[in-house]
C-alpha cells in the first residue's frame, strides 16, 4: 500500500520488492 516511486515505467520497482499497480510502484 505504500507508494515506492512515481511510475513503474521509470523506476526498478521489482528490485526493491515493490509491485506495479495502475502504473505506479507500491509496497504493502
UniProtKB/Swiss-Prot annotation:
It comes from the Eukaryota. PROSITE patterns: CYCLOTIDE (PS51052). This is a cyclic peptide. There is a cross-link at residues 1-28 (Cyclopeptide (Gly-Asn)). The keyword Disulfide bond applies. The presence of a 'disulfide through disulfide knot' structurally defines this protein as a knottin. This is Cyclotide ltri-A.
Amino acid at each position: 500500500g505504500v507508494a515506492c516511486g512515481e511510475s513503474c515505467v521509470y523506476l526498478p520497482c521489482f528490485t526493491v520488492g515493490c509491485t506495479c499497480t495502475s502504473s505506479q510502484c507500491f509496497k504493502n
